[in-house]
């Protein structure tokens, strides 16, 4: 129950756990342009804009690199250009969009480092 989308490269190391409902992307659907925006005209639905993405090609924003012995919790999103260092833990529901150093526990949206642990303590 995971979703991976790649137009460039997604590298996943050894002993990596990717749990349910995780999304890993190395691309986006191009730029938003004013002439592609439409607005919801149904008065029963809150005002939200609808973006037609079917006509916008996928564009690479850099590879995703997940090094060895990483654990990615449920419902995470790994964004283009992300590098996750070895022995790191990504907490459930986190959104990661930057470089994460090895031996890090990150959580949140956007993901922030909660703690960095040493090689001797990598059994968190």
Language model segments and positions:
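C-terminal/domain-terminus segments
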Residues: 72-112, 120-124
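Flexible, glycine/small-residue-enriched loop-and-beta-strand segment within the central core
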Residues: 1-82, 117-118
